[in-house]
Design a protein with these regions (language model features):
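Helix-loop interface residues and adjacent transmembrane-helix termini in multi-pass membrane transporters
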Residues: 49, 75-77, 136, 193-196, ...
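Hydrophobic transmembrane alpha-helices of multi-pass small-molecule transport proteins
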Residues: 4-8, 29, 69, 78-100, ...
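Signature of the 12-TM Major Facilitator Superfamily
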Residues: 54-57, 80-83, 141-145, 201-204, ...
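Cytoplasmic-side transmembrane-helix entry/capping segments in multi-pass membrane proteins
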Residues: 23-32, 78-90, 137-146
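C-terminal transmembrane-helix exit sites in multi-pass transporters
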Residues: 10-19, 43, 63-87, 211-231
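Transmembrane alpha-helical segments that form core, pore/gating elements
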Residues: 5-8, 66-68, 72, 104-161, ...
Length: 260
């Protein structure tokens, strides 16, 4: 978060054009609290109890969950087929957790997957707030607000924790990668997509996370999934795919122009 914050300070010209509108502090606060603050707490706790591969599969619940919240708060229409897809994906999530086996990478997969689900709820709340705010603000200052609020929120927590042992070179490279390419780059692109597309269509791309997570967990962490877990993964993805079909189109509201 701190690395991304310093990068955003270099974009002072774009941030200087941020024009706060009275009353928006509630949405801005809720957006920042949901993600990155609570989201990353639940995410970090989840990965202490479940494997990266299983946590990645739980993220497949985000699109139908975001669609449900968009229906409630943004009045985006969701078909019965989409709701059926959400139910199927949730059943797959429960199956994935129950079929999980304890191992070196997943000491308590049921708890870990439940915490990951809580992280997805936070992410869905964040998406709804961002979509609403993008009608009035550019994605650049909204993403910068995420970075700044995350840095302020996590700094006291970092100071009270014991300093971890790390090798300077690889650890510094990992920190810079996360700060520049994830917190700044990935979030900025994701926020631009949410601002320019219907929320249900933008979040569908998060379905790629489980695929990449499983590939890299197998490649880098030597993790594996049982046949039951693989079947549950297929059920989750099937439910998510069904949830994206036949959704009634709604016009996307005008968004703020991204400053040069």
């Amino acid at each position: 978060m701190a690395v991304a914050s310093f990068c955003f300070l270099a974009m002072f010209k774009a941030l200087n054009k941020f024009q706060y509108r009275p009353g928006d502090w509630k949405l801005l606060l809720l957006m920042s609290l949901a993600e990155p603050c609570l989201y990353f707490i639940f995410e970090a706790m989840a990965l202490q109890h479940t494997s990266a591969a299983q946590a990645g599969m739980v993220t497949a619940i985000l699109p139908p969950l975001a669609a449900a919240l968009a229906f409630i708060f943004l009045k985006e229409r969701v078909s019965g087929v989409a709701m059926l897809g959400f139910l199927i994906a949730f059943v797959g999530l429960v199956w994935l957790s129950l079929a999980a086996e304890k191992n070196a990478h997943a000491s308590n997969p049921i708890l870990g997957n439940a915490l990951e689900l809580a992280a997805m709820v936070c992410s869905a709340v964040y998406c709804v707030c961002l979509k609403k705010l993008s009608e009035r603000y550019s994605p650049v200052p909204l993403t910068a607000l995420q970075a700044f609020s995350g840095a302020v929120f996590f700094l006291p927590l970092a100071l009270i924790q014991d300093a971890p042992e790390f090798t300077l070179g690889p650890s510094l490279a990992a920190i810079l990668f996360l700060g520049i390419f994830v917190t700044l780059g990935a979030y900025l692109l994701y926020n631009i997509a949410i601002a320019r597309m219907a929320l249900s269509k933008a979040t569908i791309f998060s379905n790629l996370i489980p695929v990449y997570t499983i590939i890299f967990a197998y490649w880098l962490l030597d993790e594996s999934l049982t046949s039951n877990q693989l079947a549950a993964c297929g059920l989750i993805l099937s439910g998510v795919a069904l949830g994206q079909s036949r959704r009634v189109k709604t016009p996307v509201a005008n968004i703020a122009v991204i400053p040069d």
